[in-house]
Amino acid sequence: MVRVKRGNVARKRRKKILALASGYRGAHSVLFRVANQQVMKALRYSYVGRKQKKRIFRRIWISRINAASRLNGISYSQLIHRFKKSNIDLNRKMLSQIAVLDTVAFKTLLNA
């Protein structure tokens, strides 16, 4: 029988997966097969989560802008329309920060 010398490579690969799975409950952090499945699933979730994070933050910014603009008697869609017409180029993240932290500046933006 031919001898295959790959012990170091295989051990290194398994240890890498088990290190990624440390902190998982039960066999998910001890057994290689189960740990490998869980790590692959976790990496998929983290990839999707990074995409969802951007959507979630945009929704938060829009709802904050909407709440602040309605306190001043204008809806969100009308506010964005006004900004587009008067060439005010502020993104939603900046607008929400201004709306939450500096209400006076937000009111002056509404009147512009």
Curated annotation (Swiss-Prot):
One of its GO terms (cellular component) is ribonucleoprotein complex. Keywords: Chloroplast, Plastid, Ribonucleoprotein, Ribosomal protein, RNA-binding, rRNA-binding. SUPFAM superfamilies: Ribosomal protein L20. Transmembrane segments: none annotated. The keyword Disulfide bond does not apply. InterPro entries: Ribosomal_bL20, RIBOSOMAL_L20_CS, Ribosomal_protein_bL20_C. GO terms for biological process: ribosomal large subunit assembly; translation. The keyword Cell inner membrane does not apply. Its main location: plastid. It holds the Pfam family Ribosomal_L20. It is found in: Plastid, Chloroplast. One of its GO terms (molecular function) is structural constituent of ribosome. Belongs to the bacterial ribosomal protein bL20 family. Binds directly to 23S ribosomal RNA and is necessary for the in vitro assembly process of the 50S ribosomal subunit. It is not involved in the protein synthesizing functions of that subunit. This is Large ribosomal subunit protein bL20c. The lineage of its organism: Eukaryota, Sar, Stramenopiles, Ochrophyta, Bacillariophyta.
